[in-house]
Amino acid sequence: MNEVPLKDWIDGGHYIEYDSQQIFVHTSGKVPNSQDLPPGANPDVDGVLIIHGFPGSSWDWAAVVAEVSKHTRVVVFDLFGHGQTSKPMEGGFEENYSLFKQADLAEAVAKAEGLHNVILVSHDMGQTIGAELMYRHDHGKLSFKIHHALVHNGSTLVNLVHLNDLQKNLLAMPDKPLDADLPRENFIEGLRGTFSKEHAATDEILNIMTDQIMAKNGSRLMPVIIRYMLQRKRNLEHWPTTLFEFKSAPFSLYWGLQDPVSVEDMCNKIKEERPSTDLHKWPDVGHWPSIEVPERISKAIIDRLNG
């Protein structure tokens, strides 16, 4: 399980400015010299870029970063409206939190951190942002190269999603910030139900995740940001088709089968439509593989670095 203290994680990061907003970025590790690479490793790969999910943050990946950064450079950042990144209150979803804008942010972070050829890792809402980057890569429009795409539980195939009560309640609210914070308990209990029985979240983990949501009055924005679900529906041909037809780099799926939201039918459908997809199912894992089984995620990434 991820046991990295939130303060240590924040202290280890830095901020860049993008679109007049402050973006929290955590970069660690370094690219090894070519003579130090294991046999079969691609010397052109210069790092790992991780895109987190909703309502998570870069902290979700702290334990993975600690291990993978022993082998290469790892960059993970807080998306607009998440964690320690700016959370603008003026304007609605399309202006501030569109998945296309989040993908632009990912490109800006990669450029700022000097990434040119990466293993792209994505989860949950980040899965769809990753799909947009994969689309751009397939069409020669991405500013960096994808060496391998590792995709984890997410509901880009939104027609198959099983929304929980918290998500349904947030989607029923207007597309504007709330006047007051939502109760912490709403998030703690909503998150608790998305972990597996074998890797149940501790109170400490749930409180850290909720702290990241509540930072900068972020809970007030949840009804706005969650409209990414509706944007997925408006782009039902665009992003799922990318996952079905991605051709410009290898593509692996790692899926926790106890996920009550991003259900097994989703990874099965991607595998059915794209048989060459490297699919790994974990029966004992829920929605948060990077928190529940970081050692497995780390191994998957390191294996892709080494061959």
Would you name each region that the model predicts?
Residues V45, G53-G56, D124:
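Active-site glycine-rich loops that stabilize anionic/oxyanionic intermediates
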Residues P55-A63, V74:
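Serine-hydrolase catalytic-loop signature spanning alpha/beta hydrolases and amidase-signature enzymes
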Residues A112, H116-L160:
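Conserved hydrolase catalytic core segment
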Residues L157-K216, R220-V224, M229-R234:
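Helix-rich cap/lid subdomain of alpha/beta-hydrolase
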Residues G218-E272, K281:
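Conserved serine/cysteine hydrolase catalytic core
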